[in-house]
Amino acid sequence: MKKNSLFVLVLNCGSSSVKYSLFKDDQEVLKGLKENIGLKTGEKNHQIALEKIFEEINNSGVIKGLKEIKYIGHRVVHGGEIFKKPTLINKNNLKRLKSLSYLAPLHNPFNILGIELCLKLLPSAKNYAVFDTEFYSSFKEESFLYGLPYEFYEKYSLRKYGFHGISHQYITRLTEKILKHKAKKIITCHLGAGSSITAILNGQPIDTSMGFTPLEGLIMETRCGNIDPTIPLFLIKNHGFTPDQLDEIFNKKSGFLGICGLRDFRDVLKMETKKSKLCYEMYLRSVVKTIGSYISLLNGADAIVFTAGIGEGSAKFREDVLKHFEYLGVKIDKKKNYQKKTIISSNQSKVKVLVLPTNETLMIYQEIKEKIKK
């Protein structure tokens, strides 16, 4: 008797877009994107966007009907300390999830909206939330606590949560597969508009550059990254800035944009201005310092992996980063680096260097598949 195919829909619902992928028995058979939601060039609201997505899926020919979709996986940015693994959505879990929206006010409300709309539009499917923070839930206190009064953690949940976890988890698994599980100390570098680096030991993360929010860590496209905590206090007390103004500045007007007026790293590379060169060097320095600190934490490295827009797209940046780790025995093959091969380290290198495309959608699917098998 022929076994029924497993159809899983994966959704990433953002403030102005909905990205979807439909999987059939481990294969992505359909994908699409609705963007500019709420604007003149997009759908009026998220419900209409999702209705159109379901219509596209139903008319695609890859599925007999929407009821064949038994599971829907949702990317949710923040799981707080409550959700540490993929979670089946029921009334209680939905209520608990809503209680965490204050931790990620720019993301979680829209992730939750996607869940609620799917419960309404396709009630026969089971909905799972997969969390960006989940990968870091095994952190020990010395990894996630700040040097603040301990009661601030107990009262206000102030701690490092880490983000881009779905991407770092996927890249870690893929690296282990490619290197046949010989790499125990791995540093994964997700470098794009948002950038983060994670230290992996025996398949588990032990530190990551993003913190309580995705603002901490590296300089990014429009985010400032690490700054002295007294800077916002100074600007409020002495120059009349409000917390909301600083939130806007630190998240949307800093980073590459704030330093040289350019958002796109490709433009930063092209422009031969004093400020664009400064921006490049500052970003390079922040990446090198973070990788270097994780090498110390891991007491070495078996593999360094680059992914996302900058990590995959800029051979020059990879080369400039890796020059700083020649002392560790890192040697790259320049030809392989510029040809965008999977492994760009030379045969003589003591550390494997890889360039891999991330696939958060596939990771979410795999997480759900593992969950429903149990």
For the regions a protein language model found, what residue spans apply to each?
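Glycine-rich phosphate-binding loops at beta-strand->alpha-helix junctions
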Residues: D302-F325
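A short acidic Gly-Thr/Ser loop motif
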Residues: L11-S16, C189-G194, G211, G309, ...
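Phosphate/pyrophosphate-binding loops at sites that engage ATP/ADP/AMP, CoA/4′-phosphopantetheine
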Residues: E55-K70, K177-K180, I291-D302
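Adenine-nucleotide phosphate-binding core of ATP-dependent small-molecule kinases
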Residues: E248, K252-G261, F265-L298
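Glycine-rich phosphate-binding loop of actin/hexokinase-like ATP-binding domains
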Residues: S138-L235
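Glycine-rich phosphate-binding/hydrolytic loop that grips phosphoryl groups
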Residues: D333, N337-K374
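Short beta-strand-loop/turn "lid" adjacent to the catalytic site in phosphate-handling enzymes
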Residues: I57, V62-H107, K126-Y128, E134-L145
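Short glycine-rich, Thr/Ser-proximal phosphate-binding strand/loop in the N-terminal lobe
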Residues: V8-K44
